[in-house]
Amino acid sequence: MAERRGSSGANGVLNSLNPQRFTSQIPSIGGNTNKKGVPGTNAALTDMINKSLARNGRSSLSRPVPEVRKSLRRSLRSSQRPSIVPGGGPSAYGALQSTRDPRPLRDKNYQAVLQQEIFDYLQSRKFDIETGHAISLKSLKQPTQKDFICIFRWLYRRLDPGYSFKRSLETEVYSILKTIQYPFLDTINKSQISAVGGSNWHKFLGMLHWLMNTSQRLDSCLHKLDESKTMQLTQDITILNQPVTTLDEQDEKHEQYELMVERLFIEYISKCYKSFINMEDDFSPFKEELEIGFDRFVHIIETDINNLGRQEEMLQQDCEMFAARCEGLKLARSKHQALKGDLVKFQNYINAMKNKAEDWPRKLNQMVEEINEKKGLIKDIHAEIDKLRQALSQEDIQEIDQMNQQRDTFSKMLDTVSSKLDNLTGSVKSQKLNLESSSKVFLDTLEKFNASINGFVLARNNLQHPINPAELLIPVKANITLTDSTAITPSTILEGCTDILSSIKPNLLKVNKEIDERISALQTENNQLEKELRGLRDTITSKGHMLESMENELSNIKSEYDEYQQVSHSKLLSQRIEIEKLERKIQNDRHKTQQRVAQAEQEIEDAAFKLKELTLKIQQERVVLHRKLIKVIEYVVSFKMDVQGSIEALHDFSVEQLESL
């Protein structure tokens, strides 16, 4: 993916970088960053980033795309680490800079201790495997320049993993020690760095030991930071799993929700930034971790909502149960009132029927006696008529007339008696009909009473209040046949019960008293249940408000997530468009590069051919020069011989002249 980006993308990143975005997230380790004359960590890092951006911004147009990209990331990496210590001020390990090192570095025993600690640290961190350079105690006692360079670079990359060594060794080491504020930098100069294995090795050994301690402290701080994050996450999950009972706890849970979301975004941005600094463009694992974190967050919210829903369902079930019990109580109370009214009506009806039943036998007996008297009277009249007929047949007509007159009088009397008898018979029949209807109504009333008692007993048995129905039922004889000669009495209708007041009424009063006692107990229990119901309604209301607030919060979070997803999708589309443009540009550049490579290869071939020609020409000229040189040497030798001969001749001549003188 790095090959697809062009210079315009790199320049856009350079121009859009805001140093404060990075420095605001880096913790300050130095304890005295606010002292006078000592700028803070964030200020130092901001200055370094600004300088790096300015330097890269000026040279980005003249560099190739990969060089601009690497320069950008290296500048960011080199500007990231100085936030460990305050810039321009004292070191984090010493409040004052001193030119004198208090450590006994010249002591051989102390040097042995430092060498052993450095060797153990390098071995424990697998120095030889990572660098491919073997290390031993001898390398720390009598180091070569290569040993020192490997150890120094490895130790510094423990502090700044993205740093790239580009300049000369003396300048690079000295500038790095100055940047990280080595407290004893004045004891080292650049000329000593080029030959560290001599008499100045103890200074560099102390410097390497200081770097080792700094790396160990940094590892310890990062480990504690990871532990604190883990503990904080555990505490957050513990708090979120606790049930909410008050509004303050609900607000605290909402704050924990917000902190979890912020922590997810901060971790995602931090990991992406670290990956960008390390020249890695694959952010998909971090995005997957962010999605997993959001899934966990949504799962926690859904779990809370499900818990609240279950609590609401339980409270709703309790409320429905109490409401059903109240409805049953109201129904029992209404049935009790109805049965009580029916009992009063039945009692009044029984009393009225009892009074009537006491009068009807006497009236019926009187009617029977009158009927018997009338029948006897009729028999006497018929006997007299027969006698009169016999006497009439024996006496004369006068007597017959008298008899006719008497007959007329008797017939009138008979008509009068027959009319009275008819009236009496009609009244007897009407009374008989009334009595039959009354007896039927009485029997129907008894059946209704017994049915009501059976229903009442069944209802009481369902309520676990058993009652003996034999104590309340009025037994009625089966197949009752009433004739004119049968007197209607309680014994003719009822079976085994001659007095309802003495047998049934006490039992009904006893049951009524028990019902009144249970009603009073149920009223007391109902009052308590109503109090509990009011409390449960208040709790349901508060839980409902909490649920509404959480639903609103969830909807807000979902809307924000949808907005963020839309923005991300739009950014992704724009980036894809830009990537396509860059790919087309890269294809064009690749085509041009291939052409230039072919041209360069042709030029290389031409240059190689010219080189061969020049080599042959040089060889030929060398042969010619050798010949000329031989001639010159021969000429010089001959000239020397001639000069020596002339000198010897001159010397001999001079000697001869001197001798002649």
Curated annotation (Swiss-Prot):
GO MF annotation: an example: microtubule binding
Pfam families given in the database record: DUF5595, Ndc80_HEC
Main location: nucleus
Compartment(s) where it occurs, according to its Swiss-Prot or TrEMBL record: Nucleus; Chromosome, Centromere, Kinetochore
Residues annotated as signal peptide: none
UniProt KW keywords: Cell cycle, Cell division, Centromere, Chromosome, Coiled coil, Kinetochore, Mitosis, Nucleus
Cellular component terms per the entry's GO annotation: Ndc80 complex; nucleus
Sections of the chain in a coiled coil: 368-398, 507-623
InterPro entries named among the record's database cross-references: DUF5595, Kinetochore_Ndc80, Ndc80_CH, Ndc80_sf
Polar residues composition bias: residue spans: 8-35
Source organism superkingdom: Eukaryota
GO biological process: attachment of mitotic spindle microtubules to kinetochore; cell division; mitotic sister chromatid biorientation; protein localization to kinetochore
Function, as annotated: Acts as a component of the essential kinetochore-associated NDC80 complex, which is required for chromosome segregation and spindle checkpoint activity.
Protein name: Probable kinetochore protein NDC80
Lineage of source species: Eukaryota, Fungi, Dikarya, Ascomycota, Saccharomycotina
